[in-house]
Curated annotation (Swiss-Prot):
Upper taxonomic lineage: Bacteria, Pseudomonadati, Pseudomonadota, Gammaproteobacteria, Enterobacterales
Domain of life, source organism: Bacteria
Stated role: Co-chaperone involved in the maturation of iron-sulfur cluster-containing proteins. Seems to help targeting proteins to be folded toward HscA.
HAMAP family: HscB
UniProt similarity note: Belongs to the HscB family.
Native source organism of the sequence: Yersinia pestis
Gene Ontology CC annotations of this record: iron-sulfur cluster transfer complex
GO molecular function term, any single one: ATPase activator activity
Subunit and interaction comment: Interacts with HscA and stimulates its ATPase activity. Interacts with IscU.
Cited SUPFAM superfamilies: Chaperone J-domain, HSC20 (HSCB), C-terminal oligomerisation domain
Protein name, entry field: Co-chaperone protein HscB
Residues annotated as domain J: 2-74
Keyword Chaperone: yes
Gene: hscB
Amino acid sequence: MDYFTLFGLPARYLIDGNQLTTRYQELQRQFHPDRFATQPERERLASMQQAATINDAYQTLKHPLKRAEYMLSLQGFDLGNEQHTMRDTAFLMEQLELREELDAIERKPDAETLLAEFSRRVAQMTTTRTQQMVEQLDAQLWVQAADTVRKLRFLDKLQQQVEQLEERLFDDFA
């Protein structure tokens, strides 16, 4: 059973987060290992496995990028373990330039202001790519969606680096 079916959700990218959380809580109550404490070992193990599956499914569907990767995995794309080389050289060059720009920001006197603007740009790029990915997933353009997810991974990593720099700048200021 796929994760969408487990939670009674349609297998699409845009899902109802409240419905996901409500169903997660219901399933957690239903399969909580404590409810099976007095049952035979086989049933206890089955409930623990089911609870673990429910947790994995919830974490996957709750996180937008993981949800997209999971949808693609249902179509045979294993993005989690791939060693796929990005062929979009323009995108790769843009990423190199962005990382160089981020590295340079740290050494500037107005780093906080520059970093805030940089972060807004990365957020806008992420929003644009996410909209593109949603359209591709809805249209079942799996190859294109997989490529867009790979690009979103780059942007996600870049955003994490922005946050790390924000923390360093804040620590230096404090």
